[in-house]
């Protein structure tokens, strides 16, 4: 594809390129591996130096990036433009409508038009699924579930009884939606299992990635709001909620009845104690342990969590502790002389 056509489709301007019709691009590649027929991108300042020595045929950059040797595709949001550029060259697999003969579908289930139902899929009683759904091999949809249009469930995903799922939802491999929450009451002879009578709701445009779990509530609901994105190996406890446009990275854990606001980012291995509220726009660094409510807009780190800047300063001091101890011992020795 000619660079001029790429720029037109992406809505970008070109710089450092006198003849964009002469530049032919065949793939999108990382900056370090890019060759003369590849387009790459720079959105992180740490790669600015590499951008000036790369052999790429073109680079997607910000409006204020200084010119290097390659033609520049200028964008107000280079990372988003990079994501859209991939779609110009990559064609996702297409799944023809139809029902595999090994699928088991209840006669009371309703499946919308253009459905693609793979091998050994199970759809139980009184399920309602919208149009254009794709259910890959061994997906199981329990009784009473309602699902909107354009649902995509990869192999071995499970949606438990009476859950509600909106439009354009994606479940990656091994996801479990609506399993029993972890609820037990102390009894005289051990633990009494609390019936998990509630449900789990996923709103429109939610994506849950591989082997993550969203438990059903004991009463009420566990709710993942629109456009939230949940990474691999995330555990969301019963009765919790995740606000619109929030990102939960790999190995995040939310204990029961914890509530995450809108536009929140929880980096890898963040743990949130139960019955807490995390305000809108909060960013938590990796491995943060949240044990108190967090006000909107805060940046936090550490375990237990506190202000991110203070956490960074504390970490810097901690790395100097051997040196500081040595200095203190020298001072104590001089004082005793």
Swiss-Prot record:
Which InterPro entries does the UniProt record give?
Hexapep, LpxD, Trimer_LpxA-like_sf, UDP_GlcNAc_AcTrfase_non-rep
**Keyword set for this entry?**
Acyltransferase, Lipid A biosynthesis, Lipid biosynthesis, Lipid metabolism, Repeat, Transferase
Please provide an example of a Pfam family that matches this protein in its UniProt record.
Answer: Hexapep
Q: Which GO terms describe its cellular component?
A: membrane
Catalysed reaction equations from the record: a UDP-3-O-[(3R)-3-hydroxyacyl]-alpha-D-glucosamine + a (3R)-hydroxyacyl-[ACP] = a UDP-2-N,3-O-bis[(3R)-3-hydroxyacyl]-alpha-D-glucosamine + holo-[ACP] + H(+)
Q: PANTHER family of this UniProt entry?
A: UDP-3-O-ACYLGLUCOSAMINE N-ACYLTRANSFERASE, UDP-3-O-ACYLGLUCOSAMINE N-ACYLTRANSFERASE 1, MITOCHONDRIAL-RELATED
NCBIfam families linked: lipid_A_lpxD (TIGR01853), PRK00892.1 (NF002060)
Complexes and interactors? Homotrimer.
Q: What is this protein called?
A: UDP-3-O-acylglucosamine N-acyltransferase 1
Q: Which organism is it from?
A: Koribacter versatilis (strain Ellin345)
